[in-house]
């Protein structure tokens, strides 16, 4: 396996400084965000789409530091009602086109979450009651999500991009193994998983069992940890809308590798991935409020180096 990083983890650094820092830490692959929920600190999407010289220079600088590109990322909600969704869909398609032009075979993203009929905002349904929840879900899946993804898969395939890697994430219609297979079975094998165990942890799933169930549908992996606060979670459960900037008040928090699950767990994680046929990048994503980005990334690199040895 190879150690990678999504460059938003060091988003305060310039493109050149990110390359220098990643190479110095022993990172081998980089994932670049192109917009939507990311500010895209290292990719000028429109300019790179227009300029072959800019694309060549970008790839050359990455290679000059002994690095390769694991994926482009456009995580957002392209099926959000109204103009919001249209803007995210445009960035999604532009990112897929850029991946095609750059010879990058993977695009990391999320499924999106529509609203209900006539809604102005997205609506993540997590219960089967009251009865209108079923009506909303049927509309979301049958009228919006599945048709959208059939069209997006055709668009990607037309550009030669064959791996759209969905992150199983809260506030998305595809947030679990079961919902992933529902979409995959409807739209085909271009859709795979960007496997990030941290979200499954706070939702109460077992990432190791999920790896076994997903098998060769895992196309890309994020390395991120979650720590459950047993006191808060024991009182309130794990559904928590308090700000990430107040981690002590929350039921769970994203943390640096090893601060949620111990090193032995991460060894099992890598072993399960290999058993499933995945022997590729582990892309570090730093979102730990308690550590600086560089400190968190450095600690994550050290842990991964131990567990993949």
Task: Identify what each model region corresponds to.
Residues 5, 22, 30, 62, ...:
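Conserved, mostly hydrophobic/aromatic
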Residues 6-10, 33-37, 74-77, 112-114, ...:
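Active-site beta-loop-alpha junctions enriched in small/polar residues
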Residues 16-38, 102-103:
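Catalytic domains of carbohydrate-active enzymes, especially glycoside hydrolases
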Residues 17, 61-65, 78-192:
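Active-site acidic/histidine proton-transfer and metal-coordination neighborhood
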Residues 19-24, 48-70, 94-103, 150-159, ...:
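Acidic (Asp/Glu)-rich catalytic clusters
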Residues 33-57, 114-118:
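Glycine-rich, proline-tolerant flexible connector loops at the mouths of alpha/beta enzymes
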Residues 41-49, 142, 177-181, 201-277, ...:
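Gly/Pro-rich active-site loop or hairpin
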Residues 293-309:
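C-terminal helical cap(s) of enzyme catalytic domains, especially alpha/beta-barrels
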